[in-house]
Every structure is written in C-alpha cells, then in structure tokens.
C-alpha cells in the first residue's frame, strides 16, 4: 500500500514507527522529520495545490487533517481515492491518531509502543510538575498567545499541556473551541484582568517579539511583564497536534515553569 500523507503529524508517526517506505508524497509544509523533506516528493501545499500531483503518485490512501483540507478530501474522493480525515484537538485524540495510523498500515503493535512511550513522557512530566507545585504551593498562571494581531489564545492541546506541566492556562475556558476565531480576545485588556505570571508566545510563522508584547497599552502592570517572564516556544513544536507537542513541547513548558518557580 502506498499512502500519501498530507500532514506533518502523520509523516512523523510513520517515520517513528519505521513505516516511512509507505509514504508516496508529503505536503510542502512538512518539517518533521527533516529527512522527509529530502526523501519524499512534495505533492501539495497544506490547503491548496494541483490535485493531479497527488494522483500522479498513485496513492492507495490519503490522510488529511481537519476542515482546512475539506476541499482536498472532496476532490480526491470524487477522483476515487480513499481518504481518512483526522481532526485531533486534544492529547487523547493525538494519541488516538497514532494508534489509528498504526491500524491503517498494519503496524498497530509498533504504534501502540509509540503511544506507550508518549504516555510515559506525560506521566513523568506530571510527576515533575506535582513536585514543583508541592514545593511552591501554587501553579503559575500562564497566558499563551498563538497569534498577535488579533490576540489568539491557546488551542485545546496546548492548554492541556500547560496543565500537565503544572501551569494554569488563564483562558482555559476558551481552549475547547477548535476554531481560532472563537479564541480571539475582543479586548487585549482581558489579559491584564487575568494577571498572568508567565506569557508564552508561539506566533505561527513568525518570531515572538516580547518587547512588543510588553509595550502593549495597559500591560505594564501584568506580573509577567513586570518580572520579564516572557518566553517563546516555536510554533512548529507546540502548535502541531502530533507527537512533537508531547515529546518536545511539553519539556519546554516544564523548563519555563521550572524557571519561574525558582
């Protein structure tokens, strides 16, 4: 079976479980693992491109992600190509995605081992966070910003990772919405009112600018700004709903919150 995988998350899983030879093509936005960009043909962008390039690699199955690729899925189905659409938005759903990929390619045992390793990392992080909370007696309040204009707060899996790492997402009430538009702050002063101890920026596609955040009108009294507690985590790590958010994003969150607890 030759699969064509459209998302970086699915490509990462296939490489990790040793099934990369099944990959017939990737999107131009695939970044993990780095060797995929060298070894696999790029046959599509993420939401646009020439569907004939996908058909040219003769895939037996195409994996897509979310409503963002609904048009691609429709066109492929109309062309007679089987499509499996993922829509993972939480840590549990991400682990389920790994398991499902394993079943789809006949490598369920290897996928389950990968899930077990990720679950072990989560358990270890919870233990470290619990020890820190026991010492300090508190969870740092975190404002996570995934875009600056307008201000967009953390998506669900990021909010969950913040909690696992021992923090408190100050906009956890918004995190359940899969749509970014539902996580836009109508008034940036909402951040001031919720007084985060730590600000973490992950502006998708561009560098986080802490000096710009600190200079926002009315933000000078925010504890994170007063104490210079502004950090960046690269969007390719933390805003990817795949294994990398757990294996690399979670340790970075732990490190940031460890620093702020000292």
Regions found by a protein language model. Give the residues of each.
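N-terminal ligand-binding lobe of clamshell/alpha-beta domains
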Residues: 1-262
């Amino acid at each position: 079976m030759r699969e064509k995988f459209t998302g970086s998350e699915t490509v990462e899983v296939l490489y990790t479980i040793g099934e990369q030879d099944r990959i017939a093509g990737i999107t131009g936005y695939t970044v993990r693992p780095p060797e995929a960009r060298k070894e696999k043909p790029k046959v599509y962008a993420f939401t646009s491109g020439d569907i004939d390039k996908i058909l040219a690699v003769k895939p037996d199955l195409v994996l897509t992600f979310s409503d963002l690729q609904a048009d691609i899925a429709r066109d492929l189905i109309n062309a007679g190509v089987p499509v499996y659409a993922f829509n993972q938005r939480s840590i549990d759903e991400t682990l389920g995605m790994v398991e499902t990929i394993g079943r789809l390619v006949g490598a369920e045992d290897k996928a389950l081992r990968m899930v077990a390793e990720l679950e072990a990392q989560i358990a270890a992080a919870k233990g470290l966070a619990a020890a820190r909370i026991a010492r300090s007696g508190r969870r740092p309040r975190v404002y996570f910003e995934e875009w600056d204009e307008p201000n967009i707060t953390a998506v669900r899996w990021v909010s969950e990772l913040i909690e696992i790492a021992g923090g408190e997402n100050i906009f956890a009430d918004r995190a359940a919405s899969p749509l970014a538009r539902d996580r836009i702050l109508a008034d940036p002063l909402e951040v001031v009112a919720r007084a985060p101890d730590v600000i973490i920026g992950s502006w998708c596609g561009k560098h986080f600018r802490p000096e710009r955040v600190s200079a926002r009108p009315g933000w000078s009294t925010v504890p994170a700004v007063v104490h210079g507690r502004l950090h960046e985590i690269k969007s390719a790590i933390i805003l990817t709903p795949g294994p990398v958010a757990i294996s690399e994003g979670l340790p970075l969150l732990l490190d940031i919150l460890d620093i702020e607890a000292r």
